Amino acid sequence: MSNISVIGTGSYVPNNIITNDFLSTIVDTSDEWIRTRTGILERRISKGENTIYMATESAKEAIKNANIEANDLDLIIVATLTPDNFMPSTACSVQKEIGAMNALCFDISAACSGFIYGLEIACSMLKNSFRNKALIIGAENLSKIVDWEDRNTCVLFGDGAGSAILSKTKEEGILEFHSGSNGLKGEHLTCGVLKANNTPNKNDSLEKNNFIKMNGKEIFRFAVGAMNETIYNIQEKTKWDLNEVKYIISHQANSRIIEYTAKKLNTEKDKFYMNLDKYGNTSAASIPIALDEMNKRGLLNKQDKIILVGFGGGLTFGGVAIVWSI
């Protein structure tokens, strides 16, 4: 049976930068308060770019990086909790925009774990069918579901998209997954129906349950536990020692979660790649944006062992062990 490898990455973030200082003009907060509690300095907020546009731009980059044509794609999966439409799916809209007319397309909703879930689904579908290449996208326009009057949540989130292209290969690539869900704790991170318009300057007069609501303490506890469990299980399946792993690329939610997880794992914080200071929490987009940034910066070399790990609303969690092949 063929192996599955990552052969290309791409990403897109809006040009519009919202700093902590700007947020301090619309809610009772400060740069120091946000920075020390989250590690976030700024985030990108869409100015007209919708989820389809951001997903499409990241897909174009990934296709170019993989040195393939859009028609080479057999599968497109978009992980998002902020679609522009319920139908057609974001994946079908991306298919239209990039001209990937040979691809089977669908969306999944698993919040911040969505990209990991997408990778696992794609790997299974590639291994068990005639399909050879898949495009996995995490794309979010979270600014439209943020309560810009709630300082506990509006400081956390940003917009963006990231993509990865998978292909059947002979060389070692994606090795093992560990994933799961805990719907019993779903109430700790919720969002109702989507809003049509929402800006950092004012909220439209809709019910507050249309926005992201989060029990921060419970999510912190869940995140640290889920990350530790996931990494431990991946180590068990791969027989990797953490010293062999070059990077752990986790969901970019909060620097304290990452620092605490590193401490629990008895490993250095620098093993965890972080870019949340620039982008905030972009949900399903955070891991692929980080992966693409690392790829562009030349931080990953062939045969490097890396672990991707995510957690989020649902509640959901998941991780994957990858031998880098680009």
Swiss-Prot record:
GO terms for biological process: fatty acid biosynthetic process; secondary metabolite biosynthetic process. GO terms for cellular component: cytoplasm. Pfam families: ACP_syn_III, ACP_syn_III_C. It catalyses: malonyl-[ACP] + acetyl-CoA + H(+) = 3-oxobutanoyl-[ACP] + CO2 + CoA. Residues 252-256 are annotated as: ACP-binding. The active site is at C112, H251, N281. It is an enzyme of class 2 (transferase). Pathway: Lipid metabolism; fatty acid biosynthesis. Gene3D superfamilies: 3.40.47.10. SUPFAM superfamilies: Thiolase-like (SSF53901). InterPro entries: ACP_syn_III_C (IPR013747), ACP_syn_III_N (IPR013751), FabH (IPR004655), Thiolase-like (IPR016039). GO terms for molecular function: 3-oxoacyl-[acyl-carrier-protein] synthase activity; beta-ketoacyl-acyl-carrier-protein synthase III activity. It is found in: Cytoplasm. Its EC number is 2.3.1.180. Keywords: Acyltransferase, Cytoplasm, Fatty acid biosynthesis, Fatty acid metabolism, Lipid biosynthesis, Lipid metabolism, Multifunctional enzyme, Transferase. Its main location: cytoplasm. Belongs to the thiolase-like superfamily. FabH family. The last Arg residue of the ACP-binding site is essential for the weak association between ACP/AcpP and FabH. Catalyzes the condensation reaction of fatty acid synthesis by the addition to an acyl acceptor of two carbons from malonyl-ACP. Catalyzes the first condensation reaction which initiates fatty acid synthesis and may therefore play a role in governing the total rate of fatty acid production. Possesses both acetoacetyl-ACP synthase and acetyl transacylase activities. Its substrate specificity determines the biosynthesis of branched-chain and/or straight-chain of fatty acids. Homodimer. This is Beta-ketoacyl-[acyl-carrier-protein] synthase III.
